[in-house]
Amino acid sequence: MSLFRPKFWKIPEITETERQRLPALAAELEQRLQTVAARFPQAAFASSLAVEDMVITDAICRLKLPLRIITLNTGKLNPETEALIAATEARYQTRLEVFTPDKEAAAAFEREFGVTAMYDSVELRRRCCHIRKIEPLNRALKNAPAWLTGQRRSQSDTRSELNFEELDRSRNIAKFNPIFDWEENDVWAYAETYGVPLNELYHQGYPSIGCEPCTRPVKEGENIRAGRWWWESKDSKECGLHK
């Protein structure tokens, strides 16, 4: 019987150099958010409750900006993720706008294809994502003049060309990525310094957290998104929210 136990990803240790450069990054983030709020006061920030999104939530709330903060409860979240919604609202004394899937559409999908259909093919997994994530997000953004995300270039190959401001062609509205040029340790330096609420799964080897069936812990040295849809090729590893 093998006694080998793989080492899992851990929250990075922050260096003094990274701490020293944080004030400039935080000031730039605040300026970017204020720019968006001035141009589009009713813009919506779509939070997945990831550490990147908690950083942006913290800045929005500290600055008391009028931006909407929306999130999706797909019906397949880990309990730890659901608990973070309540913790965030308590910490910042605000209400997140929580959007959920159409119950009948979600039930019909599972009746026809089964509860584990996402493992059967990329097509079925994307259909599940559409029902549980894309359609609710479309409802959330229906009247939004612009929206914001916590995406970063260094997260994955599919995000390597992100910019601060982009055009969401599918909705014909502006899309902003206010920490697009941050590195992973910049995010954790902010989270540590400002004490932002975090998902407990980060302490269990999960650097990237989605729905429970589609997320696993990541081994030390793996790409931080290796635990998302791990059974698929890296070229298909997006849910479609950010096309």
Tell me the role of every PLM-derived stretch.
Residues 2-243:
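Nucleotide-activated chemistry modules centered on ATP-dependent adenylation/adenylyltransferase
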